[in-house]
Amino acid sequence: MTRGLIVLLVLALTACGGEADSGEGGSSEGAELFSSSVLGGQAGCVTCHSLESDRVLVGPSLAGLGERAGGTVPGQSARDYIRTSIVAPQAHVVEGFEGGRMPTNWGEVLDDGEIDALVDYLEGL
């Protein structure tokens, strides 16, 4: 009887599961935000940034960003680099790209939870 209850409990907990992962990246909400062609009345991330390493749009490709970002600015974690690049894009302009093209008001357009979700997603790429 006790063994049956344990098995039933394990099955029930397994069936509950968690939030489905978006496949790439670490946040389904972040994936949705990234994929929106318009965010807060302006061009969304996907409009200017590709997720394909060999495809460059207006801004740099974000393929593998989570792996690259940690070593970009000495002493800054990948997560901090990505967050700063979103809320203060002029702080780190990628070599070969023109500064001033990315909107500088994402910190006002997106709330902290949305920025965190976007950072989670991009860090997982």
Where are the language model's segments positioned?
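C-terminal motif of bacterial Sec signal peptides marking the signal peptidase cleavage site
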Residues: 12-15
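Alpha-helix N-cap and coil->helix boundary residues
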Residues: 25, 57, 77, 96-97
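Gly/Gly-Pro-rich "capping" loops immediately C-terminal to redox-active cysteine motifs
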Residues: 46-87, 104-108
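Sec-dependent signal peptide recognition
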Residues: 2-7
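C-terminal capping alpha-helices of c-type cytochrome domains
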Residues: 80, 101-125
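Electrostatic cytochrome c docking/interface patches
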Residues: 17-40, 75-76
